[in-house]
């Protein structure tokens, strides 16, 4: 059967706060087939950056992720503020989380992290000639460790499970052809 667009019959908020909106939708998948509830999570779009220093090492951040109860190495990034352009958000997040700036920026991709449940997209950028130029500007909810890693070391982190956020792994691999690795 050919897929078709679902029809929204009703929509109600389950949770709506500054972090996210969780909706319970009533959807008609095809005539006579209704799914109720179908949960949809709305969040702002995100940005992530593959930042390279002069020796082509990748700048990663390590932080604790409460829902999975794990410490993970990740790409620097975060939410795009209302009205903010993705590139500006990527530059801001890189500076805030790592104290780094970069002289050359290029767009890699914009992807849906989980189109089965979420409405947002993640925008990935490549930042070249990155260097740490200032102190971190962390929110009270953030505790972050930073480090530069070779491409082969990042592959090792993926294999041992310490760089395991799926969208970050995918974005890292999308950027690989541009890394000269």
Residue ranges of predicted features:
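Residue-level detector of high-confidence beta-strand sites
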Residues: 11, 61-63, 110
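Extended interaction-bearing regions that mediate binding to partners or small molecules
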Residues: 1-15
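Residue-level structural signal for beta-strand termini and adjacent loop
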Residues: 39-40, 64, 113
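A glycine-rich, hydrophobic loop/mini-helix early in the fold
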Residues: 43-70, 74
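Short beta-strand micro-motifs in enzyme catalytic cores
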Residues: 21-25, 71, 121-123, 145
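Unchanged
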Residues: 36, 46-48, 53, 78-170
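Acidic, metal-coordinating catalytic segment for phosphate/diphosphate chemistry
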Residues: 11-48, 54
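Short, amphipathic C-terminal "tail helix"
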Residues: 169-181
């Amino acid at each position: 059967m050919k897929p078709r667009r679902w029809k929204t019959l009703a929509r109600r908020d389950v949770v709506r706060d500054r972090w996210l909106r969780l909706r319970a939708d009533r959807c008609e998948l095809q005539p006579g087939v209704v799914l109720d509830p179908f949960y949809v999570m709305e969040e702002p779009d995100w940005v992530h950056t593959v930042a390279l220093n002069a020796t082509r090492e990748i700048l990663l951040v390590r932080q604790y992720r409460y829902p999975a109860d794990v410490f993970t190495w990740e790409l620097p990034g975060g939410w795009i503020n209302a009205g903010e352009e993705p590139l500006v958000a990527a530059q801001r997040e890189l500076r805030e989380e790592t104290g780094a700036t970069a002289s050359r920026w290029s767009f890699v991709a914009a992807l849906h992290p989980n189109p089965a449940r979420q409405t947002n997209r993640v925008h990935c950028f490549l930042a070249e000639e990155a260097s740490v130029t200032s102190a971190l500007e962390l929110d009270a909810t953030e505790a972050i460790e930073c480090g530069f890693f070779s491409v082969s070391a990042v592959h090792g982190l993926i294999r041992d499970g310490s760089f395991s956020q799926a969208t970050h792994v995918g974005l890292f691999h999308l950027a690989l052809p541009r890394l000269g690795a």
